[in-house]
A protein has these predicted regions:
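Conserved alpha-helical positions within TPR/SEL1-like repeat arrays
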Residues: 11-19, 42-53, 76-87, 110-121, ...
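Structural marker of alpha-solenoid helical repeat scaffolds
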Residues: 36, 70, 104, 138, ...
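TPR/TPR-like (Sel1-like) alpha-helical repeat modules
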Residues: 239, 249, 253-279
Length: 289
């Protein structure tokens, strides 16, 4: 058996462990390959994946670039670098990496979907939708692309189209809570509060700790004049995720509607405190290159 066959077998074994969530066993196989061949592009790429999965994004980027040094034109490596850059808040750099991935492989659906997400974050909705449509043409069975496309359509004010996109995501994966929650947001904005409430409730059946769904549910209940129920829902949202200013703002509005002005004032103060902290953190972050 040749050394290259041995490396291929070890990589295959590592992938089995990797997909099963047995990361230490996977790393044993990948690092064994590197001990025998420090220039093995596959081992470097999969170790980069592990690093990114553990939140070590810069290390993952460095490893992926080493893999590219030994085997250029790997679309998957550029895609991984883009994902890591996104997690580091470097949206424009991430977009450039996804563009490079597509140059390497014009039929790489994941890269088109990731590229679309970056364009959407940059407010370039028309380009984002074009990229989502390309991703979906290549892989029509990706719930993530359908739900992210829906979010972009919603942001562009195309509510009915957004709902249709969320419907497609739900048809592909009925247990994807984000699809139900986002669809409920769109239904609420479309003036369909009862359907929106059912959507939030479905999201919470799937993921009972989804703070965003509790907040959305509270806003719908307020619209339906069920103020005490709405307050209970926003309180639950804050219990789950208390560091989001808009949740405290929503609570303040409800308390004010219930005539509890002192409590509303305290909630407003908490929201202002959180907004100030957010601005402070933002000002200390390095600017996007």
């Amino acid at each position: 058996m040749s050394e290259q066959q041995t490396a291929a077998e070890l990589i295959a074994q590592g992938l089995v462990h990797h997909r099963a969530g047995q990361i230490s066993l996977a790393m044993d196989r990948y690092t064994q390959v590197l001990r025998n061949d420090p220039r093995n592009a596959d081992a470097l790429y999969y170790i980069a994946m592990v690093a990114c999965g553990e939140g070590q994004f810069q290390q993952g980027i460095d490893l992926a670039r080493r893999s590219l040094a030994y085997r250029p034109q790997q679309a998957r490596a550029h895609n991984l670098i883009g994902q890591a850059l996104h997690r580091m808040g470097k949206i424009k750099d991430a977009l450039e990496s996804f563009d490079t991935a597509i140059v390497c492989d014009a039929n790489f659906a994941d890269a088109y979907g990731n590229r679309a997400n970056m364009l959407s974050e940059l407010g370039r909705n028309a380009e984002a939708l074009s990229s989502f449509d390309r991703a979906i043409a290549l892989n029509p069975n990706s719930p993530n692309d359908w739900v992210n496309r829906g979010a972009t359509l919603h942001g562009a004010g195309r509510i009915d189209d957004a709902i249709a996109s969320y419907d497609k995501a739900i048809a592909l994966d009925p247990a994807f809570c984000v699809s139900h929650c986002n669809r409920a947001h769109a239904l609420f904005d479309a003036g369909r509060p009862e359907e929106a409430l059912a959507g939030y409730d479905r999201a919470l059946e799937i993921e009972p700790k989804m703070a965003e769904a509790f907040l959305g549910r509270a806003l719908v209940l307020k619209k339906l004049a069920r103020l005490e129920d709405a307050l209970a829902s926003v309180n639950k949202a804050i219990e789950l995720k208390g560091d989001v200013a808009r949740m405290h703002e929503a609570r303040a509005s409800l308390l004010r509607s219930l005539g509890r002005e002192d409590d509303a004032h305290a909630a407003d103060a908490r929201a202002a405190e959180l907004e100030a902290k957010k601005r402070e953190v933002s000002e200390t972050q390095p600017s996007q290159s």
